[in-house]
Design a protein with these regions (language model features):
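Conserved, mostly hydrophobic/aromatic
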Residues: 131-132, 177, 199, 209, ...
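Carbohydrate-binding surface patches
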Residues: 454, 460-463, 468, 504-546, ...
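Glycan-recognition surfaces
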Residues: 261-294, 298, 344-476
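Alpha-helix-loop-beta-strand connector modules within alpha/beta enzyme cores
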Residues: 232-239, 336-357
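C-terminal beta-strand-rich structural cap/linker in extracellular carbohydrate-active enzymes
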Residues: 565-604, 647-661
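Solvent-exposed beta-strand/loop surfaces of large extracellular or lumenal domains
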Residues: 108-118, 549-568, 635-660
Length: 661
């Protein structure tokens, strides 16, 4: 690391650790802490000497906005500068360097990679803390290694040390039903009744039903519109009566065309000239409430408490990025940066709603929500198509590339969309005029084939966060509804990428399963994606450290027994399809063992309650929120050294016995 520490030292940084891990910040004169401030610049010559020539190096860039796509790129004429926030990984021939911010709550910042070299900047908007002689930048780190996944794990542990603890020791593993992804803003009270009736009749095990944008009169006027004449308290009561937690969508910092903004113009976020700033959603501009103004903060608290008193305990909070997006903004409290304004606003929400409520922050700043959010969105809104530009492909990439943040919150990959539906929403429905709905005609459509739908559902499992569905349940095809068996209940373990830099979207993912049944050993689920347009089989690029049985739970077939160093080839996978394989460590003694079920992607991790084994039988008990048939498999040793697979079909809430004679 000496070449890097020497280069950083020449840039005037100050080290907290200067060994195999470089931790540092920079002391900046307060007169200079305005706008974009360079923290360091390491020239292309030094980077090349350290093993990272500008053009050949692959660069993984994390991204600030949920709608951006984290991923791996190289410099080109189209992308002469690659930017990342909060972290960037340089990769060249199994040689990796991670550079990232450790602190993420005081000011914005980003990293740049260009033919000139590696650069990091702090973004002080507005000018920082007038009256002080100097300020310190957020701490940063440089880590070096050969495995980018391990570097991100090391980085995550360091980020924990420099940021607030999560709001709770155990995040809620909710399964959420949401209305936006079919109805948009047009859902009515009667349609809610229809959804709840189907959830009850079909025993769909949802923890939360969330009412999305479209219930309110306007942004800032948080009272029900004409589609909800019985009121939102009654809607919450209906959801509770159906056995679920009431959830609701709000955007507390955006201001629509409402009287209170004219009555209290001082509550609006403005620039240095006093002009009220706006954030556009599509073509629609919205003014922004400034939570650093005490009166505005008190008003925000008042409507939050009113919604809480209606009975809502799950809050999807949207468009919070409006507080830090415009570098020209000057908060009422002129001693804070825009990122501190953002965190002040989110803190206001957390303190007002309390720990009883689950906060799902959508469209904010991931780092600055650490210690405040229960859930954050991992990517853009989902649609029921596969297209790379705006479909399932990119949503999976956004989700898995942000999985390292799972130590700080539960990820929300947005709703899984499984339906087959060629008809869009009718333009005659009541589209509330203050809400921008992109491509409303296609919002309710779904064109994923069976393989694509299964892969899109698999994204929820890979995320390891909450599971969310966005369907009109009265019309959902039964065979597509069964896909929910694979992800409900959530297992809560995010997947790790195996082939990080080998493909734009990695093909292989490992999920460590700690089974519900205490007598079963842990195992790994290896998920494989074929994002190509041709059917193909793939060679597993990872390694196994002990003999394992590789089992295909969906097909109830044994792929083989593999030792360290053996080549493991997947089954042929359809275009845009996936395979979920179970890697089971072989017992040291040759005796029968439980292999898998075909119910859930964990292959027995969440639904197997008990297992006991004798020389000739495997007995167990299943317990699931679903009432359905399940295939159960066990492995029995044969005298010739091979293994026999015995299967049985049983109910998902019953005992099972597997016998081999």
């Amino acid at each position: 690391m000496k070449i890097w520490s020497d280069a950083l030292n020449a840039c005037g940084v100050e080290f907290s650790a200067n060994t195999e891990v470089l931790i540092f910040d920079k002391k900046i004169a307060s007169s200079d802490a305005a706008g974009v401030v360079e923290l360091f610049f390491i020239s292309r010559e030094i980077c090349s000497a350290a093993g990272f020539p500008a053009v050949e190096t692959q660069v993984h860039c994390q991204k600030r906005q949920k709608g951006e796509i984290p991923g791996t790129e190289k410099l080109s004429s189209e992308t002469p500068v690659l930017t990342a926030d909060p972290a960037m990984v340089l990769y060249n021939q199994d040689h990796c360097l991670l550079c990232g911010f450790l602190e993420m709550t005081r000011h914005l910042g980003h990293l740049e990679w260009s033919e000139g070299g590696l650069r990091a900047v702090a973004e002080y908007h507005p000018a920082y803390r007038p009256g002080t002689d100097f300020v310190r930048s957020q701490k940063m780190v440089l880590l070096q290694g050969s495995d980018p996944v391990q570097l991100f794990e090391q980085y995550t542990e360091l980020v924990k040390q420099y940021n607030p603890a999560p709001p709770r020791s155990q995040f809620p593993r909710y399964t959420v039903g949401a209305n936006w992804h079919y109805y948009g803003p047009t859902m009515t009270e009667n349609e809610l009744d229809e959804e709840l009736a189907v959830i009850k009749a079909k025993n769909i095990p949802l923890d939360v039903y969330q009412l999305d944008d479209g219930w309110e009169r306007d942004y800032g006027d948080w009272h029900p519109n004409d589609k909800w004449n019985s009121g939102m308290a009654q809607a919450a009561d209906k959801i509770k009566a159906a056995g679920m937690i009431p959830g609701i969508w709000i955007t507390p910092f955006l201001c629509g065309n409402i009287k209170i903004a004219e009555q209290h113009p001082q509550w609006l976020l403005r620039n240095a000239s006093g002009e009220a700033l706006t954030m556009k959603i599509g073509p629609l501009p919205f003014r922004i409430f400034d939570p650093s103004h005490p009166e505005c903060a008190a008003w925000i608290k008042s409507f939050l408490k009113e919604i809480y008193n209606w009975g809502y305990r799950y809050f999807k909070i949207d468009f919070t990025r409006c507080l830090f997006l415009n570098p020209a903004a000057v908060p009422f409290d002129k001693s804070i940066t825009l990122l501190e304004l953002y965190r002040q606003g989110i803190t206001l929400l957390r303190e007002t709603l309390g720990d009883e409520c689950c906060l799902n922050l959508c469209g904010g700043h991931e780092g600055a929500t650490i210690g405040l959010a229960d859930v954050t969105r991992t990517g853009s809104d989902t649609y029921g198509n596969w297209a790379k530009s705006n479909g399932a492909w990119t949503r999976i990439q956004q989700c898995v590339m942000r999985s390292w943040m799972s130590s700080f919150r539960m990820g929300d990959p947005d709703a899984s969309i499984m339906r087959l539906n060629s008809e869009g929403l009718s333009p005659d429905r009541d589209f509330t005029p203050h809400i921008y709905v992109p491509s409303y005609s296609s919002l309710s459509q779904g064109s994923l084939n069976d393989d694509e739908a299964a892969t899109f559902i698999l994204n929820q499992f890979l995320c390891g966060g909450i599971s969310e569905i966005g369907e009109r349940l009265p019309d959902l095809q039964p065979e597509r509804l069964k896909l929910l068996h694979k992800i409900i209940p959530p297992c809560g373990t995010p997947a790790k990428m195996v082939d990080f830099f080998q493909h734009p979207l990695p093909r292989f993912y490992r999920t460590r399963i700690v089974p519900r049944c205490s007598t079963l050993p842990e195992w790994e689920i290896v998920s494989v994606l074929n994002i190509g347009d041709e059917a193909a089989a793939f060679v597993y690029p990872g390694t196994v450290n002990e003999p394992v049985m590789v089992f295909h739970p969906e097909k109830m077939t044994l792929l083989g027994i593999f030792n360290p160093g053996d080549k493991i080839t997947t089954p042929v996978i359809a275009p845009h399809g996936s395979a979920v394989l179970k890697f089971i460590p072989l017992p040291r003694e040759r005796k029968p063992f439980f292999a898998a079920t075909d119910l859930h992607y964990s292959a027995g991790g969440v639904e197997v309650e008990t297992v006991s084994v004798t020389e000739s039988t495997i007995n167990g008990k299943l317990s699931s929120p679903w009432d359905t048939d399940v295939k159960v498999a066990g492995a029995f040793p044969r005298p010739d050294g091979s293994w026999a697979i015995v299967t049985a079909t049983v109910n998902s809430n019953s005992e099972f016995t597997l016998t081999y004679a």
